[in-house]
Amino acid sequence: MTRSPSQRGFTLAETLVALFVLAIVSAAGTGLLMGASSSSKQLRDKETEIRTLDMAQAFLRNDIAALSMRATVPETGFGAPGNLFGNASDQRGPILAFVRSGWVNPQSREDRSTLQHVEYRLENNTLIRTATVRPDAVTGTPRVERILLEGVSRIDVRFLRGGEWSREWQGDAGQALHILPDLIELEIVFEDERELIISALTGGRI
């Protein structure tokens, strides 16, 4: 029995053409999915980067805004007291070190004041914030370290007081302890040559 033209199946050539078209469509679809997945990952990475930068800026701004005139003595117990120390990252010691106020202690539940000593330092291209539970820390005083930024090559810091800038601040170097800068500016340079500038007014000014 012969089949009518409407009942005739696909020829081999037609089948091969259909498979070829299907392969092209599938490849295009896979490419679109991979592209979308890559774009989604890039977006997530960018969002993570922005959150990290925002958090680092928030810590620095909040700490500087809460800067206290309270002087501290070196952890060793030797040396003059000081209320603010600052240097560029290529110098010895922390980039910033000072006492901040406003550390909330609801109903005085913990055996501590609202003051804490904070330090910012650059180690192995990583910006680290260290906070102690007491302003006058000694060996064994509990402290909390937090990594704020990675991939940092250099940090420069400037201090503005009465319209004049200086690149270091030594709170025990012949200055009255009640004198604080009006503004602190940090220029953070990353290994990929990006730059982040953070300027913050200080607390405890007179």
Segments predicted by a language model, with ranges:
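Short, surface-exposed coil-to-beta transition loops
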Residues: 113-117, 142-143, 197
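Local beta-strand/beta-hairpin segments that build beta-sheet-rich folds
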Residues: 127, 146-153
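Short aromatic-glycine motifs in intrinsically disordered, low-complexity regions
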Residues: 134-147
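Short linear sequence signals and composition-biased patches located at protein termini or domain-edge surfaces
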Residues: 151-206
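Extracytoplasmic beta-strand-rich oligomerization domains located immediately C-terminal to a leader/signal peptide
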Residues: 28-137
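Short solvent-exposed loop/turn micro-motifs enriched in small/polar/acidic residues
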Residues: 111-113, 139-140, 150, 179-181
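A broad, low-specificity signal marking well-ordered, structured residues that form hydrophobic/aromatic
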Residues: 96-97, 146, 184
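N-terminal single-pass transmembrane signal-anchor helix
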Residues: 1-36
